[in-house]
């Protein structure tokens, strides 16, 4: 039985690799992501072609002092565009655009408006044939996705398991022990 640390605990590629959360350009300014990471393929050191940004947003209709209110989905599209342009020189050089990694910007909305509570929406690029029946392979244009996860309960929407899990995990109405118990009993999740 080996006792060398490299033999007993061999290197395993991480499934998730954290990235720098600051994206700074001279002409476009700075974007500070809450969390950004690359997803890795299981059982290999190769990266999956996914870059994921995760944002926790308290205000569902944020206000910019100069310009007034804006929509989170539009900010998510901008974040995706920045994550794509930041790949030049890293994921691809010159005109090797086929090497662009798909990006996701996922927004966990803590206090959405009442009608948005419990909603899970996804926004992405889609092909529309305006004339003719030619089709491009989806992998060539499916490069960005914005997802809004709106917490809270809504009697008009059947609660998804993900929203139920996040509602419990992030609840400010439950004690730590109550959260632990509910997460384990309802979702089989053991919090440490």
What are these regions (language model features)?
Residues 1-192:
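Elongated, amphipathic alpha-helical interaction scaffolds
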């Amino acid at each position: 039985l080996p006792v060398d640390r490299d033999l007993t605990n061999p290197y395993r590629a991480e499934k998730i690799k954290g990235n720098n959360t600051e994206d700074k350009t001279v002409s476009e300014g700075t974007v500070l992501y809450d969390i950004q990471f690359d997803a890795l393929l299981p059982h290999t050191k190769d990266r999956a072609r996914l870059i994921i940004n995760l944002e926790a947003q308290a205000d569902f209709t944020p206000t910019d002092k100069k310009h007034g209110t804006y929509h989170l989905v539009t900010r998510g599209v901008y974040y995706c565009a920045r994550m794509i342009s930041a790949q030049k020189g890293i994921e691809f050089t010159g005109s090797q655009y086929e090497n662009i990694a798909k990006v996701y910007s996922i927004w966990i909305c803590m206090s959405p408006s009442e009608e948005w509570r419990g909603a899970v929406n996804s926004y992405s690029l889609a092909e529309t044939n305006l004339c003719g029946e030619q089709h491009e392979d989806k992998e060539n244009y499916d490069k960005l996705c914005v997802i809004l996860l709106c917490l809270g309960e809504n009697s008009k929407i059947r609660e998804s398991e993900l929203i139920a899990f996040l509602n419990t995990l992030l609840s400010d109405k439950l004690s730590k022990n109550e959260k632990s118990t509910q997460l384990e009993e309802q979702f089989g999740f053991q919090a440490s």
